[in-house]
Design a protein with these regions (language model features):
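Short, basic interhelical loop/turn and adjoining N-cap
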Residues: 59-80
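Short, amphipathic alpha-helical "recognition" segments used to contact nucleic acids or chromatin
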Residues: 43-58
Length: 168
């Protein structure tokens, strides 16, 4: 076991992370709770709020910095944005292929629909994530509590399960 100290901008939490030794490969395996990202200090909700505000509301760095009141620092938010942007197309292509297989009637896949009207890969990924979440909610009752604002958190968890690696 080891301790992680994730932050939400106002306080630092202390979370126990359990780890096991894989008998097959002799590497350690950790089980992170779904509100933590690998290699990030801030909670997934905090990262998600920044990325969505930047992508969909067009929030400037000065606006985000003023709202954050110093935590997270603007340079940290910029790193999240760059990381998200560098992975967005890769994740988007996987989500679109998955939707085409599982929900071919999805409005996101309509050649005259919402998917063709977005202006960038970050916005496209967030849009596709909403449709993926809607599809998943129709299949699994456990997702009933997820809403539109949770779509980035959901897609990160889904992508981790798909082996997509790091998004932010």
């Amino acid at each position: 076991m080891y301790w992680r100290k994730p932050r939400d901008g106002e306080r630092v939490y202390r979370v126990a992370i359990y780890r096991w030794l894989c008998q097959a490969c002799q590497r350690t395996v950790s089980a992170l709770p779904d509100f933590l990202l690998r290699f990030r200090w801030y909670l997934l909700d905090v990262v998600s709020e920044v990325v969505v505000a930047r992508a969909e509301q067009g929030a400037s760095w000065s606006e985000l910095e003023a709202e954050a009141k110093g935590a997270p620092h603007v340079r940290t938010m910029q790193r999240w944005w760059v990381s998200f942007g560098s992975q967005a197309l890769r994740w988007l292509s996987v989500i679109q292929a998955f939707l085409a297989q599982q929900d071919s009637g999805s409005p996101w896949l309509d050649p005259r629909g919402e998917g063709v009207r977005v202006t960038g890969s970050a916005q496209a990924l967030l849009g596709a994530a909403g449709y993926l979440l809607a599809w998943a909610k129709s299949r699994w009752r456990e997702l009933a509590g997820y809403s539109w604002k949770d779509r980035l958190c959901f897609v990160w968890l889904w992508g981790s399960g798909q082996g997509l690696g790091r998004l932010v």
